[in-house]
Amino acid sequence: MKYTTQKLYDLPEGNRQEDAPRRVEKKKKRRRKWLWLTLLTVLILAGVAAALLWDANAFDGLRRSLLYARAEKDETGCAKLYSYDSDEARCFAPLGGSLAILSEGRLQVLNEHSEVAYSATVHFLAPALSANGDTAVGYDIGGDTVYVLSPLGLRWQKTVPGAVLEASVADNGNVVVCHEQSGHKGAVTVYDSVGEPVFAYGSASRFLMTGALSRDGNTLAAITMGQETGVFESFLTLYRTDSDKAVASAAVCPGIVYDLCPFDSGFCAVAEEGLYWLDRNGSTTATYPYNGLFLRRCQVSDGNFAAVLLSRYRTGSETDLITVDGEGNELGGITLSREVLDLSASGRYVAVLCTDRLIIYDKFLTELASLPFVSQTRAVFMRSDGSAVMAGADSASLYLP
């Protein structure tokens, strides 16, 4: 077979004035088309992102729908996660993806499949549970042993040198135990993640009321109570955990301080007559007085606000729910005519458990969701993503608004 070839210079050259511009023009059109499509896509995505970020509640709702897409939910939006014996459930605490349950006779951890990850027989008279993140501490008020739990079970247990008054978990995972101690009117011991004591403070002259560790774990705050000039007052004492010398000591308020919580870089004291915000120098930076109203409940959120439930009378169902920022300013306020069984706050959300329904608000007390028929629910635990764990007599569910 014979092949013929043609030299390059024998091919027709074409019209350089016309052909070249036509080819370049086609490429420009394609590039412009892709450029416009890309720009339009970017603008749409930017608009969606801006809308979600502007409305943080909508962003959390989208995140919940993605995280719990496979969860089996009933018609109310609840996913049943845990089942347990009603006789062994007195106190509850969410523990990462698990649930800690404590009664007078048993301490348990149930994993996310409702399987028993840990179980121990105890002999408690006044059981109590406290949790933060993936760490919980169970104890008997007046007893001498604390059990520190992880989502997988027991992390460590310890016998403390005196009757336990209260115990809590700091943001860094350390455990703060307030207890009685011989020769003192109360003591605070801080334990690390393996149960070793890393700091201890004993109050020799005033009665210890409560204690807390700052969010970075570097400062211990203790509230003591004593009589000055014939009046009982609450005092704040601050220590750096790497030193045995007090940083500051100052009077906080007259009367009793019920709770002390880390708040931003300082602390918030929940007292008999108001809320007090304290810095690490012992100074009171802001206050919120109750103005003669009675304190029913208070929750200090890790989102840097406090939700306080006040009443004009010591008894009765009508209460005022108020949220307050770290400068003592009201963020929102509403009057509740229903009896409140439990109150919980986390992130930017507040959960209010009433006798007939669960209501979820944002920190400005705008109602976001309401769930009726909750008569079997004993406790509620708000989560920072806008969901809430509801613990009942024999089961616990996750409410996904």
Per-range role (PLM):
Residues 1-80, 85-87, 401:
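Sequence/structural signature of beta-propeller modules
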Residues 31-32, 79-93, 122-134, 162-173, ...:
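Repeated scaffold domains used in trafficking and secretory/extracellular systems
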Residues 54-58, 106-108, 144-148, 183-189, ...:
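Structural motif
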Residues 70-84, 113-121, 152-159, 196-202, ...:
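A short beta-strand motif characteristic of beta-propeller blades
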Residues 99, 136, 174-176, 217-220, ...:
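Hydrophobic beta-strand positions that form the internal "hydrophobic ladder"
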Residues 117-223, 230:
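Non-cytosolic head/periplasmic domains of membrane-anchored proteins
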Residues 184-278:
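Solenoidal tandem-repeat scaffolds enriched in leucines and small polar residues
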Residues 283-373:
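Intrinsically disordered, low-complexity segments enriched in Gly and acidic/Ser/Thr residues
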